[in-house]
């Protein structure tokens, strides 16, 4: 059945799954939408209460479009919507993001195999989108790109992507305010930032994540090769390799994205800085 106005209520758990026109799951039953504009978008899009679209008894393959027919632009905008809903539910009612994150990680892995140039181009160009969400997506895309170039297995890459999508859970509530902030940070803000890797790990454990690689990657993604990072001031090869990849992806994404108090850096300038200006902090073999 097509989703129409009146079927979804604001701040009430969804009574059904919502599927896109291609049959893929967009939102899971039980998710709460807190913004009316999001409901309006769902009603404007071609979305359904069953994976088979209008006909509950029709085979999905007979009516869905192929995933390859979806442009990268459409996919990024759709993914931004899904991530925003997921993280909003997490901040508002403690929604467990793990299932959504792991599914999106696999999607991103395949997108980065099938159309890496378009994906990379989009996350460079769309820095106008909601800061906390596009930065999270940038971290995942750049991490997958790096891991693929290192020849990592699919399982290892998707696990890394999951870490990239959750590394900032511990400061997610602050990210939009920090984006708009100019001038020195207050002491409590600095303390929260320095604690966020450990806070993120605690949150993931609370949501049932037991994978040590995922947790280690998140917990040490702000360590630096020269020992200047946090929280444990680890150095060199003592830093988990996944964390070293996340550190580079995060630094690169942060620097190409605009902030209230500075303009975005060009990709060339950022890479030059990573290779020269900050070469002691980041694993140069990975850079």
Predicted features along the sequence, with ranges:
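Short N-terminal micro-motifs specific to bacterial/archaeal maturation
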Residues: 29-30, 130, 184, 191, ...
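Helix-turn-helix-type domain boundary/helix-start signal
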Residues: 31-32, 150, 183, 208, ...
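Short clusters of hydrophobic/aromatic residues that line enzyme substrate/ligand-binding pockets
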Residues: 18, 33, 179, 185, ...
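Terminal helices and disordered tails flanking the catalytic cores of nucleotide-processing hydrolases
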Residues: 1-92, 96-99, 103, 264-287
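Alpha-helical scaffolding flanking metal-ion-dependent phosphate/phosphodiester catalytic sites
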Residues: 139, 162-173, 191-202, 206-287
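Short, contiguous strand/loop micro-motifs
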Residues: 24-26, 130, 187, 229
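Acidic/His-rich, divalent-metal-binding segments that scaffold phosphate/diphosphate chemistry
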Residues: 59-194, 199-213
């Amino acid at each position: 059945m097509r989703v129409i106005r009146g079927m979804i209520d604001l701040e009430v758990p969804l009574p059904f799954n919502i599927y896109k026109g291609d049959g893929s799951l967009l939102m899971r039953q039980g998710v709460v939408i807190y913004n009316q504009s999001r409901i309006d978008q769902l009603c404007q899009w071609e979305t359904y209460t069953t994976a088979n679209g209008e006909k509950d008894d029709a085979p999905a393959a007979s009516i869905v479009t192929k995933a390859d027919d979806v442009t990268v632009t459409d996919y990024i905008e759709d993914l931004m919507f899904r991530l925003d809903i997921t993280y909003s539910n997490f901040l508002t009612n403690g929604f467990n993001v793990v299932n959504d994150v792991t599914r999106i990680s696999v999607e991103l892995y395949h997108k980065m195999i099938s159309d890496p140039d378009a994906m990379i181009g989009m996350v460079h160009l769309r820095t106008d989108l909601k800061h906390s969400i596009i930065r999270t997506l940038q971290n995942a895309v750049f991490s997958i790109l790096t891991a693929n170039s290192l020849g990592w297995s699919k399982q290892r890459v998707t696990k890394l992507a999951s870490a990239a999508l959750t590394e900032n859970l511990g400061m997610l509530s602050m990210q939009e305010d920090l984006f708009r902030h100019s001038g020195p940070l207050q002491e409590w803000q600095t303390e929260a930032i320095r604690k966020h890797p450990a806070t993120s790990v605690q949150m993931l454990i609370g949501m049932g994540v037991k994978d040590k690689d995922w947790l280690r990657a998140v917990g040490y993604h702000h360590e630096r090769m020269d020992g200047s990072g946090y929280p444990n001031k680890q150095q060199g090869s003592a830093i988990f390799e996944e964390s070293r990849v996340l550190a580079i992806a995060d630094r690169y994404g942060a620097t190409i994205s605009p902030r209230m108090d500075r303009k975005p850096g060009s990709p060339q300038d950022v890479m030059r800085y990573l290779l020269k200006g900050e070469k002691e902090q980041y694993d140069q073999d990975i850079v």
